[in-house]
A protein has these predicted regions:
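N-terminal intrinsically disordered/low-complexity leader segments
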Residues: 1-57, 246-258
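Generic hydrophobic, amphipathic alpha-helix propensity
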Residues: 55-67, 83, 108-119
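Hydrophobic/aromatic residues within well-ordered alpha-helical segments
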Residues: 58, 101, 108, 112, ...
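Helix-turn-helix
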Residues: 61, 69-103, 107
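Hydrophobic alpha-helical connector segments
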Residues: 107, 121-150, 203-204
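Amphipathic alpha-helical packing segments from all-alpha helical-bundle domains
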Residues: 117-121, 146-150, 159, 166-191, ...
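Secondary-structure edge/capping motif, primarily at the C-terminal ends of alpha-helices
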Residues: 120-128, 155-165, 214-222
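Hydrophobic/aromatic-rich alpha-helical bundle segments in the mid-to-C-terminal region
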Residues: 189-236, 247-258
C-alpha cells in the first residue's frame, strides 16, 4: 500500500495565517493531532496475533530470540530452527506463529516502525512559525536521534527487511507519510512566505531526506549520536534559511493565500 502524500494546501493553512498590509503573516496554530500509522496489511500471509496469554508469551519469545540471534550471528545466518532452539520451543511450534524467518523479521520491523511513527508525531506536534522553527527543528532531530540510538540493536533487521520487495514498499510508504507530516508541520511557514503547494512539498521532501540520510546506517554510540545530530541540524537549518531568504522576493497577493 502506498501512502498518499499530501501537499501543503491552502485550506489547511488558512487557520494559521492572515493577510496584513498585503503580506501573509503566520500566526500561532493549534497542535497537530497524531496521524494514523500508515502501514496496513503489508506483510504477506500474516498470521493472526493470538489472544491467549500463554500464546502471546510464546510469540514474544520467538520475536526476542530472532532479534538476539540477528544481533549476535548476523541476519543472513539465522534459520527457523535456530530461532526455535533459542526460544526453547519445537520448530513446529514456531511455524504455528510465523510462516518463515522473514515473517518474524517483518513483525520486528513493524514494531520498530510503530515506535518510529509515534516518536515522529510527538516531535512534530507544534507547527512552525518564524519564532519557533529553529527550536522545533532542534527538538525533532534530538528526539529522532535518541530513538535511533535506542533501537540500534534492531538496525541490521531493519536494513534487511527494507532490502526485500515488501520492505521496500513499506519503507516508501513511511517516507511518503513522513513528508506529508512535514507538510503539516513545517509547511505553513513556507506557504506564508509565498511558496506554492508544490514548492512546499518539495522543500519538506528535501528536509526529510536530509535528516533521514544522517541515520541511514544507524546510530550505535552516544558520540555518533552527537556528531550526526549536529550535522543533521546544521544541514537542515541551512536549507531552511536559504528557502526563507529566497521567499522574500515580491509576490502578488490577490486576496487569497498563494
Amino acid at each position: 500500500m502506498r501512502y498518499m502524500c499530501r501537499t501543503c494546501d491552502t485550506e489547511s493553512m488558512k487557520s494559521s495565517t492572515r493577510v496584513t498590509k498585503g503580506k501573509i503573516v503566520l500566526e500561532s496554530s493549534a497542535r497537530l493531532t497524531p496521524d494514523t500509522f500508515p502501514l496496513k496489511d503489508w506483510i504477506p500471509g500474516r498470521r493472526r496475533v493470538p489472544t491467549q496469554e500463554r500464546s502471546q508469551r510464546t510469540r514474544r519469545q520467538i520475536l526476542s530470540a530472532a532479534e538476539a540471534l540477528a544481533k549476535n550471528e548476523g541476519v543472513g545466518n539465522i534459520t527457523m530452527q535456530m530461532i526455535a532452539a533459542k526460544s526453547k520451543i519445537a520448530a513446529g511450534t514456531a511455524y504455528q506463529f510465523f510462516d518463515d524467518r522473514d515473517a518474524i523479521f517483518a513483525e520486528i520491523y513493524e514494531e520498530w516502525a510503530v515506535a518510529f511513527w509515534a516518536t515522529l508525531n510527538k516531535a512534530t506536534a507544534t507547527p512552525w512559525s518564524d519564532a519557533t522553527w529553529r527550536s522545533e527543528l532542534h527538538g525533532l532531530i534530538t528526539q529522532m536521534g535518541k530513538f535511533y540510538l535506542e533501537s540500534s540493536s534492531r538496525w541490521d533487521i531493519i536494513r534487511y527487511v527494507e532490502s526485500t520487495k515488501q520492505g521496500r514498499g513499506a519503507m516508501r510508504t513511511l517516507l511518503d507519510a513522513n513528508i506529508s507530516r512535514f507538510c503539516d508541520w513545517a509547511g505553513p511557514l513556507f506557504r506564508a512566505r509565498g511558496y506554492s503547494a508544490a514548492e512546499c512539498k518539495a522543500i519538506c521532501g528535501l528536509l526529510v531526506r536530509t535528516i533521514r540520510g544522517h541515520w541511514v546506517y544507524g546510530v550505535y554510540t552516544p558520540q555518533e549520536l552527537r556528531e550526526l545530530s549536529k550535522t543533521a541540524e546544521d544541514g537542515t537549518t541551512a536549507i531552511v534559511e536559504v528557502k526563507l531568504t529566497r521567499a522574500s522576493r515580491p509576490r502578488t497577493i490577490t486576496g487569497k493565500s498563494v
